[in-house]
Swiss-Prot record:
InterPro entries reported in the protein's UniProt record: Herpes_TT2 (IPR005208)
GO biological process entries: viral DNA genome packaging
Disordered: region residues: 1-69
Chief location bin: host cell
Subcellular location per the Swiss-Prot or TrEMBL entry: Host nucleus
Its biological purpose: Component of the molecular motor that translocates viral genomic DNA in empty capsid during DNA packaging. Forms a tripartite terminase complex together with TRM1 and TRM3 in the host cytoplasm. Once the complex reaches the host nucleus, it interacts with the capsid portal vertex. This portal forms a ring in which genomic DNA is translocated into the capsid.
Keywords: Host nucleus, Viral genome packaging, Viral release from host cell
Protein name: Tripartite terminase subunit 2
Name of a matching Pfam family: Herpes_UL33
Compositional bias annotation for Acidic residues: 11-27
A cellular component term, taken from the record's GO annotations: host cell nucleus
Organism annotation: Human cytomegalovirus (strain AD169)
Statement: the UniProt record of this protein carries the keyword Plastid: no
Amino acid sequence: MSWAKQRVPFLDDDDGEEENDVQDDVDSPVPTRPLVIDEDAEPAAGTSGGLEGGGGDDEDGEDGHALPDLDDDLLLQFEPMLPRVYDLLLPSLDARLNFVNAGQKYAAFLKYVHGDCATCSHGEILREKTQLLTAIVSKLMDINGILEGKDESAPGK
């Protein structure tokens, strides 16, 4: 598999117009090979398969410079955590991540409430937040009680 230099659009400092030129940054430690989604890729030993990040033949680029070579293929697989129906309800990745995050918070809270918190790493945080919320609510109730008590005593005087 051969890889050409990645074309990166950048602004020319002279006239401010966007140009599509090859960016000459051969000394960069970060490889410029794009990640390719290959759903049918066979996973390498010890990996899960899925995304493939370039390791290919060592060929010269357009200007004769050798492209950086990755000795091993990077294979990753991301499995969906939500059923397919949520693709319609939560169209963006941010919405899906927020949904999963909120679900994890509720699951941690349910573990805390039902006493299955021995293995929960968030138990202490939940206890502190619950105590803080209880203190705030009790102060608000005391303020309301004081105000109600003053309102009742004011007409009697």
